Design a protein with these regions (language model features):
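Charged, low-complexity intrinsically disordered terminal segments
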Residues: 1-172
């Protein structure tokens, strides 16, 4: 955490992020995923029950499927989720990310979705916090633009948000 995250300090201009509020069983799932990694690197295990919910609110609307990448395995779970969103998109996929550092499979998936008529938009920072990653991100622009991907840069400050939104039905 840093002061720029709450715009108390403006090292990169206005800091733009995204957040959601979750309640219910998904929160416990995320807690367990965090504690699994936390405990793997601690000499003494943290007691999970200290963080267990005492009550769960009634389900409102929608479905939340918790997932997380972990340094404890080789499974690229988040990438698999993102590739699935791109392959199933029919109308649009909007992606906000501060760092576009992708492999060939993801690059191909972005281009393929655009070529089959999906409105693929990337929203990236126009002001870098990490210059090397900023240059890497921009190195993908030309092949993506040629495939029909629309690329926007957030310039009032630094875009730190990380979101995939597709077809009014799924977000990550």
């Amino acid at each position: 955490l840093a002061d720029e995250y709450i715009n108390a300090e403006q090292r990169f201009g206005y800091w733009k992020d995204a957040a959601i509020r979750l309640e219910g069983a998904a929160v416990w799932n995320f807690t367990v995923m965090f504690l699994n990694v936390w405990n793997a690197f601690r000499p003494q295990e943290t007691d999970y029950t200290a963080f267990a919910p005492t009550r769960l609110p009634a389900v409102q609307d929608g479905v939340v499927q918790p997932y997380a990448d972990s340094p404890l395995d080789e499974e690229p779970l988040a990438e698999t989720v993102y590739l699935d969103i791109l392959s199933q998109a029919q109308r649009y996929v909007y992606i906000y990310t501060p760092y576009l550092a992708v492999g060939e499979e993801m690059l191909d998936a972005l281009k393929s979705a655009a070529k089959r008529g999906v409105d693929v938009r990337l929203i990236l920072p126009g002001i870098p916090d990490k210059k090397l990653v900023f240059r890497l991100s921009r190195s993908y622009y030309l092949p993506l633009l040629r495939a029909g991907v629309r690329i926007y840069e957030f310039t009032p400050g630094f875009l730190h948000a990380k979101c995939y939104v597709s077809d009014d039905r799924v977000a990550a």
